[in-house]
Amino acid sequence: MEHYISLLVRSIFIENMALSFFLGMCTFLAVSKKVKTSFGLGIAVTVVLTISVPVNNLVYNLLLKPGALGENIDLTFLNFITFIGVIAALVQILEMILDRFFPPLYNALGIFLPLITVNCAIFGGVSFMVQRDYNFAESVVYGFGSGVGWMLAIVALAGIREKMKYSDVPPGLRGLGITFITAGLMALGFMSFSGVQL
């Protein structure tokens, strides 16, 4: 149990997808204007990561891993296309659920919801799972923790950006300029966790 708690804390704070690996920055910067929208996207990313990492773990271990289907069969060359296909299917299902049950959130996320399919944070989580050889339970914990970490980062940035609307930002830095600086300072803050050994 201790190992899983350690993995969860590490994936949220120490190995934060957005602020340590800088994955998913396109949606991270574009959607972080309002806390409510950022929280909705963060929940969507967390759900997709929590489901796609373990599902891709099963697909990898049962079909793609060298020797999974037979002693001399190696299908690892299909990793990328298979992982992206599984992620795309899960995002499509999530999109249909949001459209049916949460129309305001679906409309607020707009084009960024289908972009979760190609969000490198999602694919990065799946790739790290394969690279680190996580088992199924570790994949569930890692996927959930990575999603929560990404959501924490985007909601924090959105909160700061909402407060900056009322600040006197120099004209040359308004918009994405000050957002990049803010994200960089947040990343420095998360770097303080890098020395923590769990």
Curated annotation (Swiss-Prot):
Which reactions does this protein catalyse?
a ubiquinone + n Na(+)(in) + NADH + H(+) = a ubiquinol + n Na(+)(out) + NAD(+)
Q: Where in the cell is it found?
A: Cell inner membrane
Please tell me whether the keyword Protein biosynthesis is annotated for this protein.
Answer: no
Q: Which GO terms describe its cellular component?
A: Gram-negative-bacterium-type cell wall; plasma membrane
Q: Which domain of life is it from?
A: Bacteria
Give, as one word, the top-level EC class.
Answer: translocase
> Tell me, what is one Gene Ontology molecular-function annotation carried by this entry?
oxidoreductase activity, acting on NAD(P)H, quinone or similar compound as acceptor
Give the record's keywords alphabetically: Cell inner membrane, Cell membrane, Ion transport, Membrane, NAD, Sodium, Sodium transport, Translocase, Transmembrane, Transmembrane helix, Transport, Ubiquinone
Q: Name one GO biological process term.
A: respiratory electron transport chain
Pfam families per UniProt: Rnf-Nqr
Q: How does it sit in the membrane?
A: Multi-pass membrane protein
Give a yes or no for keyword Transport in this entry: yes
- Tell me which EC number(s) this protein carries: 7.2.1.1
User: InterPro entries, from UniProt?
Assistant: NqrDE/RnfAE, NqrDE/RnfAE_oxidrdctase, NqrE
Task: Name the residues that span the membrane.
Answer: 11-31, 39-59, 77-97, 110-130, 140-160, 176-196
Q: Which family does it belong to?
A: Belongs to the NqrDE/RnfAE family.
Quaternary context: Composed of six subunits; NqrA, NqrB, NqrC, NqrD, NqrE and NqrF.
Its function? NQR complex catalyzes the reduction of ubiquinone-1 to ubiquinol by two successive reactions, coupled with the transport of Na(+) ions from the cytoplasm to the periplasm. NqrA to NqrE are probably involved in the second step, the conversion of ubisemiquinone to ubiquinol.
Q: Would you tell me the protein name for this molecule?
A: Na(+)-translocating NADH-quinone reductase subunit E
Instruction: Please report the organism this UniProt entry assigns to the protein.
Output: Vibrio anguillarum
